Amino acid sequence: MIQNDRASAALGMIVRGVEPGRAVVSMLLRNDMMNGFDVTHGGIVFALADTAFAIACNDDHHVTLASGADITFLKPTTAGQTLTATAVLRTRSGRSGLYDVRVTNDHNVPVAEFRGRSRTTNLPLPGTAAPSL
């Protein structure tokens, strides 16, 4: 999935680790990611958390998509910092999943908390032979 994610690539995201139900993704903040107050645009932080969430929830043979998500911003960040998003599966029931993503700065201080809700489809992940659900 991440190999074809042009948006994440354009933002310079790097996958640091993947395990079943878990993913770690980082990104160096650039000047063009800052808003009018010279702090990181919230959509950039959301995109990082959303990418970690997407990787964590696509650990099976079926395409899993977001059914909803929300984010709480805790601290501002600025250009030159590296953010790291760690997504963790909290619970899965049938086709539905719930994931928490913590976004931290260079000092491992939380700067945002994201909660994602997922829904697994019948579609196989590209390049895999998915068993029936």
Task: Identify the function of each model-found stretch.
Residues S26-L28, D70-T72, T86-V88, R102, ...:
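Residue-level recognition of well-ordered beta-strand positions that form the cores
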Residues A9-L11, G21-A23, G42, V63-A69, ...:
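A generic structural signal for short beta-strands and their flanking turns/coil linkers
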Residues M34-A54, N58:
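Compact, glycine-rich, soluble single-domain proteins
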Residues A54-T84, L89:
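Hydrophobic beta-strand-centered segment that forms part of the acyl-chain substrate-binding groove
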Residues M1-S26, R30-N31, A129-L133:
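Non-catalytic linker/capping segments at the edges of enzyme domains
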Residues D38, H61-H62, N108:
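Detector for glycine-centered tight turns/loop "hinges" at secondary-structure junctions
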Residues P20-G21, R30-M33, T51-A52, A79:
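Short, charged/polar surface micro-motifs in flexible loops or helix N-caps
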Residues T77-A79, R90-L133:
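HotDog/MaoC-like acyl-thioester-processing domains
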